[in-house]
């Protein structure tokens, strides 16, 4: 019997209900093994299954499956404060809390086996790492520091809670303060730290651009394109050829425009709207036909799959495909011929798509419009711009009306519409931050989002009913346990949600967002709600999108910057244009799509993490020269160690309780408030106060505030010293650890899936707050 087949047989045997852990000899007897060769195969299979974590050997040398032995296999998600959670491989199981002393040298991302502890505190399941099956971290980015005989690297990733020991012969030219990439040569063992050698010196930590370069290396973001991909890009023509037009619908005589940001270079979507005689609208969404140029398994395609998505950092874009294509032949630049895939829809006055057609086309856009100019035409009634674009103004007004119809329909069905502010960090040519401003979101931005949403839904539904292998954008229903915590949380503010944690419609959550709109608690309730939900991801199954409250959704509209969109285009070409729906074709895609969906979802999360980190880094840098300055802000979160205050430009800092010196403040957990025991002063979420910047740590991305008007010295230092033991039994070095975990509004889940807009609040001065009466429940 082949090894794989024997392993499968052995695993099936152990999964039987009557099975109890057995020794090798007992298994030999139970499986009627008589030949020496068969016994060798049994031992090899047991070793292989144990290495994969599929079975476990007990101290008495008995073998069984983890689930029957109070064990769970999963991935470690570490926290900067030393503890971690196990994310079980079986997604139906809840996360398991791992205390710091129970990690047993496991690091963030490691695949481990955890034994559940019978005496877990409260309702939270706790566990102990008993075996590390697979190490995740091979390289670490950090700051090099040295002593006389050795060096060490302080990791940028605070989830790695111990420094990396660098022997003298492993520093490879690194000097004090250098940002370096370290290759690990051994992992933590007992009281000894991980050991490594310097592989790359990025530069001194204070050199321009090194901060962002460190983030790029930390997250493993790609650099230059491979030579074969660049060669393919160079050989791609700059203009379309007559032969490219075969079997394409010619739309070059239509009035079609792109509407994007003023600095956008990769224009992958164009739109047109016509009002029909019966009151319906004809909407054309035309997307750059990237799949025509990036063919399957070509060098660019392989690299695009690996990258998964373009990454938009504050000072640069790391593109998914080479700029020669993304900014050139694939970009729908004005007044030039471009190949597209089109989705034309007829939409009635209720926002229903009554007819649609998906086809390949060629277009020539009439104008390259900006959000700013369209907003000035539609919102500000700018006469100069109306005159400049006079032939287009009626279409823009039709677009505005159609977008409102589509939005009304989406909200009526219960889509969850978050209302977070979103910031944009402006930097100079050297990467130094100039300003942090709020991204304006007005009519033009929203109408494009509505058009992209309806096109994505229409394409998804079309292929759902074709019943062929496809890739969808899904957003599953929230985890009942997390949602239950949110429902309990909102009751402290007097709100009651219709439905239960196990059975809730998105409309019920939207009703809460409507109720808190422009109220002090809006930000924190929206944030906690968002965090109670699952992340949207890609999947071969059409499972619907909870947040958008739609049964069918995919990503069709951005093939320049998202690989799943490119796959959707490839499938449109395969199934619709080439008519290949045979069994072999479907089997091929049914086999490939699960891996593509999983990988691109992972690459999307990597990109979001890197983008968020560079934003936070530059926000802290922006505040470095603001120490001593005063700002108006709003309390965005209250914890037992202080209050987080958000400034109007979304920058957030901590007022540590030790800086609240006019009284002794206690944390009222039920009402998320700080209450002065002597004065009765109350600080709660949503209160507007004036703060002074007292400290900024760019490396830790921490900003410290104090409340203006509170005099005196802090009662105790904010920073808590914690020791990190050094390898080889060297004395521990004291490290300053952050004690805060900011509750910040998350950036939009992705363009088009959540809306954001700034909001205005009444200002409350200083710390002289009278206690508020208890809020009444919403009816």
UniProtKB/Swiss-Prot annotation:
Keywords: Cytoplasm, Exonuclease, Hydrolase, Nuclease, RNA-binding
Positions of the UniProt region annotated as Disordered: 709-779
Localization, UniProt: Cytoplasm
Domain (RNB) ranges: 248-577
Pfam families: CSD2 (PF17876), OB_RNB (PF08206), RNB (PF00773), S1 (PF00575)
GO cellular component terms, semicolon-separated: cytosol
InterPro entries in alphabetical order: CSD (IPR011129), CSD2 (IPR040476), NA-bd_OB-fold (IPR012340), RNase_B_OB_dom (IPR013223), RNase_II/R (IPR001900), RNase_II/R_CS (IPR022966), RNase_II/RNase_R (IPR004476), RNase_R (IPR011805)
Database matches in SMART domains: CSP (SM00357), RNB (SM00955), S1 (SM00316)
Knockout mutant characteristics: No visible phenotype. Increased half-life of type I toxin-antitoxin system RNAs of BsrG/SR4.
Listed GO MF terms: exoribonuclease II activity; RNA binding
Domain S1 motif: 628-708
Inducing or repressing factors: Constitutively expressed, part of a 5 gene operon with multiple promoters. Not ethanol-stress induced.
Keyword Zinc in record: no
Main location: cytoplasm
Catalyzed reactions per annotation: Exonucleolytic cleavage in the 3'- to 5'-direction to yield nucleoside 5'-phosphates
Extent of Basic residues compositional bias: 725-736, 757-779
GO BP of this protein: mRNA catabolic process
EC class (word): hydrolase
EC number: 3.1.13.1
Similarity comment: Belongs to the RNR ribonuclease family. RNase R subfamily.
Cited function: 3'-5' exoribonuclease that releases 5'-nucleoside monophosphates and is involved in maturation of structured RNAs. Involved in degradation of type I toxin-antitoxin system bsrG/SR4 RNAs.
Protein name (record): Ribonuclease R
Species this protein is from: Bacillus subtilis (strain 168)
């Amino acid at each position: 019997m082949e090894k794989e087949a024997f392993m499968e047989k052995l695993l099936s045997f152990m999964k039987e209900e009557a099975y109890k852990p057995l020794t090798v000899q007992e298994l030999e007897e139970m499986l009627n093994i008589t030949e020496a060769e068969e016994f060798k195969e049994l031992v090899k299979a047991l070793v292989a299954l144990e290495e994969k974590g599929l079975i476990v050997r007990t101290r008495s040398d008995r073998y069984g499956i983890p689930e029957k032995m109070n064990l769970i296999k999963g991935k470690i998600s570490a926290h900067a404060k030393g503890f971690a959670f196990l994310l079980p491989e079986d997604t139906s199981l809840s996360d398991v809390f791992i205390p710091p002393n129970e990690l047993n040298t496991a690091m963030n991302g490691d695949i481990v086996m955890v034994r559940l502890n019978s005496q877990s505190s409260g309702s939270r399941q706790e566990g102990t790492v008993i075996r590390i099956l697979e190490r995740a971290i091979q390289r670490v980015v950090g700051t090099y520091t040295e002593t006389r005989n050795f060096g060490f690297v302080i990791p940028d990733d605070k989830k790695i809670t111990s420094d990396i020991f660098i022997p003298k012969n492993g520093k490879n030219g690194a000097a004090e303060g250098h940002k370096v990439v370290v290759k690990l040569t051994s992992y933590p063992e007992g009281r000894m730290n991980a050991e490594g050698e310097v592989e790359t010196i990025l530069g001194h930590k204070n050199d321009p651009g090194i901060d962002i370069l460190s983030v790029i290396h930390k997250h493993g973001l790609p650099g230059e394109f491979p030579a074969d991909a660049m060669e393919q890009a160079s050989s791609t023509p700059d203009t379309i050829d007559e032969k490219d037009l075969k079997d394409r619908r010619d739309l070059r005589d239509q009035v079609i425009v792109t509407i994007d940001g003023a600095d956008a270079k990769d224009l992958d979507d164009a739109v047109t709207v016509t009002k029909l005689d019966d009151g319906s609208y004809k909407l054309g969404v035309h997307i750059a036909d990237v799949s025509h140029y990036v063919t399957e398994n070509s060098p660019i395609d392989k690299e695009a799959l690996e990258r998964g998505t373009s990454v938009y950092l504050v000072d640069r874009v790391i593109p998914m495909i080479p700029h020669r294509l993304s900014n050139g032949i694939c970009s729908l630049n004005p007044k030039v011929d471009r190949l597209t895939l089109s989705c034309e829809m007829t939409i009635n006055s209720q926002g229903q798509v009554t007819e649609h057609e998906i086809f390949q086309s060629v277009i020539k856009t009439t104008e390259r419009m900006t959000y700013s100019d369209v907003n000035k035409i539609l919102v500000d009634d700018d006469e100069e711009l109306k005159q400049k674009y006079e032939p287009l103004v009626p279409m823009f007004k039709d677009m505005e009306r159609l977008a409102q119809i589509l939005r009304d329909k989406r909200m009526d069905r219960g889509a969850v519409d978050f209302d977070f502010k979103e910031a944009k960090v402006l930097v100079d040519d050297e990467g130094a931050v100039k300003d942090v401003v709020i991204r304006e979101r007005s009519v033009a931005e929203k109408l494009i989002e509505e058009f992209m949403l309806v096109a994505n839904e229409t394409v998804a539904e079309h292929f759902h009913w074709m019943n062929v292998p496809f890739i969808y954008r899904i957003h599953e229903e929230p985890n009942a346990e997390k949602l239950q915590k949110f429902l309990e949380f909102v009751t402290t503010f007097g709100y009651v949600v219709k439905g239960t944690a196990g059975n809730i419609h998105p409309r019920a959550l939207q009703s809460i967002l409507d109720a808190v709109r422009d109220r002090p608690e809006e930000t924190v309730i929206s944030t906690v709600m968002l965090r109670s939900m699952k992340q949207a991801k890609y999947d071969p199954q059409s499972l619907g999108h909870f947040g958008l409250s739609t049964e069918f959704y995919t990503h069709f509209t951005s093939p320049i910057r998202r690989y799943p969109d490119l796959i959707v285009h490839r499938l449109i070409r395969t199934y619709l244009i080439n008519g290949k729906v045979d069994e072999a074709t479907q089997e091929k895609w049914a086999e490939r799509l699960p891996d593509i969906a999983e990988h691109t979802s992972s690459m999307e999360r990597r990109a979001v993490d890197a983008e968020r980190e560079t934003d936070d880094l530059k926000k802290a840098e922006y505040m470095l020269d603001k120490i001593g300055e005063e700002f108006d802000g709003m309390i965005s979160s209250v914890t037992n160690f202080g209050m987080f205050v958000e400034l109007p430009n979304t920058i957030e800092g901590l007022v540590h309780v030790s800086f609240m010196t006019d009284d002794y403040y206690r944390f009222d957990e039920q009402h998320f408030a700080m209450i002065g025991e002597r004065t009765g002063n109350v600080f709660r979420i949503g209160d507007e106060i004036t703060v002074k910047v007292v400290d900024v740590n760019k490396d830790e991305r921490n900003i410290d505030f104090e409340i203006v008007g509170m005099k005196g010295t802090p009662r105790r230092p904010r920073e808590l010293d914690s020791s990190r033991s050094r390898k080889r039994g060297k004395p521990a070095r004291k490290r300053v650890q952050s004690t805060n975990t900011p509750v910040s509004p998350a950036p939009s889940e992705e363009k088009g899936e959540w809306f954001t807009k700034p909001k205005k609040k009444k200002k409350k001065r200083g710390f002289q707050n009278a206690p508020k009466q208890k809020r009444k429940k919403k009816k």
